Regions:
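Interdomain/boundary linker segments immediately adjacent to catalytic/signaling cores
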Residues: 1-42
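Domain-level recognition of nuclease-like catalytic cores that cleave nucleotide substrates
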Residues: 3-13, 120-162
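A generic alpha-helix signature
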Residues: 37, 41-45, 104, 108
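Conserved catalytic cores of phosphodiester-cleaving nucleases, focusing on short active-site segments
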Residues: 46, 50, 71-94, 109
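A short acidic/basic microdomain associated with nuclease active sites
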Residues: 52-66
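Short acidic/glycine-enriched loop/turn segments that link adjacent beta-strands
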Residues: 66-68, 142
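Catalytic cores of nucleic-acid endonucleases
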Residues: 88-142
């Protein structure tokens, strides 16, 4: 009887442990620092906002193996491949969120977009127009507000070279 009670206690402990781990895995966001949580919430809001506007989202948080950083959202709008840099805030500051996309960030996004383009069939690459947009997401108590800057910065050359 005592060994049966020990087994029952062990089973209950394992079930609690498994439940705790599964819950933490399902809601990893609770473990994130506030600024990363805001970023993920902003990217999620941007995803649904852009889908509602008719964009076809083909990648989220896309990473290249040899280029630092990621592409927040990649979408098709007609025949244009749009790379979205999402900037999320919980308050509106004097400086817009989009102001953080400086020349270094633009260079990084161009390199990542070039790496992403290599995934497309080679025959189609020259005809793909790439556009870099910035989407600022303000996560306010009254709901999310969006500021979209289409074609925020140009490609370096006209042949899909960044």
């Amino acid at each position: 009887v005592e060994s049966l009670m020990n087994l029952s206690s062990l089973t209950l402990t394992l079930e609690r442990s498994l439940y705790t781990r599964l819950r933490a895995r399902a809601d990893r966001r609770s473990l994130l620092p506030p600024h990363l949580l805001t970023g993920q919430r902003g990217e999620d809001a941007a995803f649904f906002h852009l889908r509602a506007l008719g964009y076809t989202i083909v990648a989220r948080r896309w990473h290249a193996s040899r280029v630092r950083g990621d592409l927040d959202l990649v979408a098709w709008s007609g025949t244009t491949l749009v790379v979205f840099e999402v900037k999320a805030r919980t308050v509106r500051d004097l400086a817009p969120a989009a102001a953080e996309v400086d020349h270094l960030k633009q260079h990084q996004l161009r390199k990542l977009a070039s790496a992403y383009l290599q995934r497309l069939p080679e025959a189609h690459r020259p005809s793909v127009r790439i556009q870099f947009d910035i989407l600022s997401v303000y996560l306010l108590p009254t709901g999310a507000e969006f500021e979209h800057i289409p074609d925020a910065f140009p490609q370096v050359a006209s042949t899909n070279r960044f």
